């Protein structure tokens, strides 16, 4: 059975392992190196594990094993209000297709509502149709495509 729950200190090793996998996977995709930048599992976990702040780290379990994670933050919108932003959602390859990602996204929606967010954003890298389709299945709609040109 799949389950999403808030991450606890005992999950740190699993979260570090999952973030290492997520960073490698993202960096290998088109546009991924710009997204990943100099992020490491340590720097990301430091940012996402401050109790009381407008950020939440959840883990996804399957049969009692942590196989996925999701980080969501409440960010202020220019016109007022808050948006829940999915900063990371990753499920181990072998555990995909059993509902862990869906459970994590639903937990992010619940957390965002509790923080007063009125909408949510999530990123999908160019060409990452699997992520785009999963997000659309969870009720997200594409609304903006950002293109970039390096000036060096």
Feature-to-residue mapping (PLM):
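Conserved beta-strand in the GNAT
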Residues: 57-59, 65-74, 85, 90
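Conserved acetyl-CoA pyrophosphate-binding loop and the N-cap/start of the following alpha-helix
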Residues: 95, 99-107
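Conserved beta-strand-loop-alpha-helix junction that forms the acyl-donor binding cleft
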Residues: 93-96, 121-131, 148-150
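Conserved N-terminal entry element of GNAT/NAT acetyltransferase domains
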Residues: 1-13, 17, 21, 30
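Conserved active-site alpha-helix within GNAT-family acetyltransferase domains
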Residues: 102, 114, 126-144
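Conserved GNAT-fold acetyl-CoA-binding loop/helix
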Residues: 20-46
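A conserved beta-turn-beta hairpin within the catalytic core of GNAT-like acetyltransferases
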Residues: 76-87, 96, 143
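Conserved GNAT acetyl-CoA-binding A-motif
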Residues: 112-124
